[in-house]
């Protein structure tokens, strides 16, 4: 009934348990039906949330490229193309989506559905999320509200996208060729220092503390 996020066709469910945001495996839907005419008439905030969730696939893709080149998470071509091939077109007309244009609402919806299918294909949220979603999860764990109301997933991801993109631009401005890797590693905090900081930040929050120490 609304193009509000990409989870409709995804395999997993991101749930807050004991104060922590965790992703649980769950069966994907056998089928999905969306009427673009109905979706185009949904509250504008829902479409805006979906647009923000979909535009997050841009910095998420950059994160995946970094993970691939560093040998941490290899890019899966099939799921990559499910998300990225139609992304530009799906994001091409935000004003028209806001105005309730049926055709462009359908394109946005297709982009979100393909993102969910990509997560199904890889059994991972990697094709559809990156650092920007980590911001959203942190805010979920803090019960973020605006004017007394909980903030939608898409809006949180949208703000996370701005922060993630700024971080990527900051990285691109650095002189990587002359980076002294050994000096950077030497300057990194020891585990003892990190553990002390984690225990201070999550004091009084046992669930958060256990997750912080684990990760």
Question: Residue locations for each model-derived region?
Answer:
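Active-site segments that bind and position negatively charged phosphate/pyrophosphate groups
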Residues: 80-214
């Amino acid at each position: 009934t609304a193009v509000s996020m990409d989870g409709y066709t995804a395999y997993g469910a991101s749930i807050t348990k004991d104060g922590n945001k965790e992703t649980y495996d769950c069966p994907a839907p056998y089928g999905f039906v969306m009427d673009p005419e109905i979706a185009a008439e949904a509250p504008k905030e829902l479409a805006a949330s979906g647009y923000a969730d979909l535009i997050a696939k841009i910095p998420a893709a950059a994160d995946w490229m970094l993970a691939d080149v560093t040998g941490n998470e290899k890019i899966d071509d099939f799921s990559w193309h499910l998300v990225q091939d139609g992304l530009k077109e799906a994001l091409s007309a935000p004003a028209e989506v806001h105005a309730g244009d049926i055709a462009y609402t359908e394109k946005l919806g297709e982009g979100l559905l393909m993102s969910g299918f990509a997560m199904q294909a890889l059994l991972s949220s990697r094709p559809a999320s990156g650092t920007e979603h980590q911001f959203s999860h942190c805010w979920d764990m803090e019960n973020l509200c605006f004017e007394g109301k909980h903030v939608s997933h898409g809006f949180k991801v949208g703000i996370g996208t701005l922060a993630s993109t700024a971080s990527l631009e900051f990285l691109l401005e650095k002189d990587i060729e002359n980076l002294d890797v050994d000096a950077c590693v030497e300057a990194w905090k020891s585990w003892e220092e990190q553990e002390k900081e984690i225990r201070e930040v999550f004091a009084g929050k046992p669930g958060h503390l256990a997750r912080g120490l684990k990760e």
